[in-house]
Amino acid sequence: LTPKSILEFLNKDGNILLALSGKASTSSAVSSLLLEIDIHLSNDRSSVVVDHFNYDTVSAAEKHDVLLLQRPGPLRPDVKAFFDGEGILALPRVAPQTLGSDSALVAPILRAPATAYAYNPKEEMPSAEDIEGTGSQLNVVSAMQARNSARFTVLGSVEALEDQWFSASVKAPGGKKTPTVNREFAKQLTAWTFKETGVLKVGKIEHHLATEGEVATEDLNPKIYRIKNETVRNSDSQSHACSITNCSV
């Protein structure tokens, strides 16, 4: 697959879930593809997110590269939350993403905590110059909804989808062991990406000239209107017409 063929798939209303890993360098082809939609990886494409305060003490006692995060809420109070809920997510070896400022079509789903930072783990003792980004400027999960409503979601931790993390028990520093909710979050993420949620499903549509009183059946849905006609349009919908950043509650 080439970036061109994947973009052509998106242009034909295809939806994509891309999972990355900080365990290995991301290919230049994937990096180039993400640049096309204004999602940026680290310069060396090998960075991983670590957090010395929000990590799993069971599996990452030394490297602190298994993030423990709450599920995300809505971006704004007037936006529907598709990924919220109770419980802790375990996200091993996250490949961080940052978003460009030129596109209103991309949005963060899950940001890194304020105490997190990204660096190349090949550097044993990272200096300030080695740090690729910090805090909420780093995205763990990002998404793009194109103008044709095609959806592209980037998950920074493919390991988070493995069976072992669906049924794992994790423990934050100073906390108690708790089961992960990776399975539930994966269902939410795939449901949004592949348009099982957040899609307007229009049923019955009626339109007619604006008049007082009852409208006769034969006056519904006329084929022609004049320029200055006032009209009324009614439709039945089953859901919201939603992107991540634009969905009324």
Where do the protein language model's features map onto the residues?
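Short, surface-exposed patches at the edges or C-terminal ends of soluble domains, predominantly
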Residues: L1-V249
